[in-house]
């Protein structure tokens, strides 16, 4: 069993008409290298308490992220894929928000790591908007 979510960020000055309200528009150039370093830290089994919604009713905040891939096309669209057996409420959007902070230089990798290990929602970046989130695949 596994689910694949993808999140779309348009990383350029303007959004293409077809992508309006279907991507998160981020004008500031994001560092793909920094975001990939963060994705590597999120991969594996962790306590994702810092990344869950305050209204999340899951019994355990421990989840295993099997894979995170980040790709950017020529038009500036960044696609981030997350693969796991299950996710917490708002977990993917919260992880994307933190990866964005890392990519734009608001956080360094040690701050990113501290947030993951803190288990405190208050230290997490704001969750990314829902408009860029897609459930791509479910395997039974």
Residue ranges and their predicted role:
Residues 1-140:
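Structured-RNA-binding interfaces characteristic of tRNA pseudouridine synthases
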